[in-house]
A protein has these predicted regions:
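Solvent-exposed adhesion/ligand-recognition segments of exported proteins
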Residues: 1-202, 209-212, 219
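A detector of low-complexity, intrinsically disordered, Ser/Thr/Gly/Pro/Ala-rich segments
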Residues: 155, 240, 275-277
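Sequence/structural signature of small/polar-enriched beta-strand/turn repeats
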Residues: 63-64, 71, 98-103, 121-122, ...
Length: 279
């Protein structure tokens, strides 16, 4: 097969019955995996999975010619030689300032207890980040929480050191996500989602579902809909914009709207069980 990185490479004789559909790279180590370059699938597209329960640090990494690229701190669940999903008990996936270039992968999944995005993440058709202690299926569609319940139902994101809070999904000022559609899921103990960078869906929706709060001081832009749902407070100090669909912010407590929400061809919905504060 012809490759971008290594030119012509010989086929694997152990795969005489056909190309691999899923390539699972499972690391059992006390240390996180550090990815600083590219991985390429030679031949027909395949799904690429890198799994390390101790964490994954990507800084200038990327995957070429993958249908789906998954970085996870979960343990791979394999039945009869078939990958079924991942069981996440902890661990963090960190993307450094040099970013993650999966622009030649169709879909990118980050599945971990926490995700910290300090650089850009690119993928062709979709990016989905799922955080928390969960059982997650192989395509990141079914998510079942298996960690301790937040039985006192407190807002775990609130403390006196606002900027030093810990979030399940944290996108810094230099961080960003760029794909046709983007979905962030905080299914943890209510630590929430913070975006100080740029989350941009070039052809579809941006969806954020959080068991805690959602704090946006950056830019969230969607070609279709921007749909933010939180159990706790939604605080917008930045910019939320849609070109064709609605911008919807739904909170089970309150919405604090201090930034701008622009819906060029749709409507703006602020829905809350308590109150909406606008300044």
């Amino acid at each position: 097969a012809q490759t971008q990185m290594a030119g012509w490479v010989q086929g694997n004789p152990n795969l005489a019955r056909g190309e691999a559909k899923v390539i699972l790279n499972e690391v059992n180590s006390a240390n996180p995996s550090r990815l600083k370059g590219y991985v390429e699938v030679a031949g027909k597209k395949a799904d690429v999975v890198i799994a390390n329960p101790s964490g994954i640090q990507c800084d200038g990494c990327g995957v070429i010619n993958a249908g789906r690229t998954t970085l996870t701190t979960g343990k791979a669940e394999v039945e009869n030689g078939e990958l079924k999903g991942y069981r996440v008990k902890g661990g963090k996936v960190t993307v450094g300032q040099k970013g993650m270039d999966n622009s030649q992968s169709d879909y990118t999944d980050i599945i971990a207890e926490k995700a910290e995005i300090k650089g850009g993440v690119w993928s062709k058709k979709g990016i989905k980040v799922t955080t928390g202690k969960n059982n997650v299926d192989r395509t990141n569609d079914s998510v079942v929480y298996v960690g301790d319940k937040n039985t006192d139902n407190t807002d775990r994101t609130s403390d006196t050191q606002g900027e030093n809070q810990s979030y399940s999904v944290d996108v810094s000022q230099l961080g960003g996500m760029y794909s046709e559609k983007i979905h962030l899921v905080d299914n943890g103990q209510g630590l929430g989602v913070r975006n100080a960078g740029h989350i941009g869906a070039s052809a579809g929706d941006v969806k954020i579902d959080s068991q805690g709060r959602i704090v946006n001081s950056g830019t969230i832009s969607a070609t279709h809909q921007a749909d933010l749902n939180a159990e706790k407070v939604i605080e917008n100090k930045g910019k939320i914009e849609t070109k064709q669909g609605n911008a919807a912010l739904r909170s089970q407590t309150r919405v604090e709207q201090h930034g701008s929400i622009v819906s060029r061809q749709g409507g703006v919905l602020l829905q809350t069980k308590d109150k909406v504060t606008q300044t």
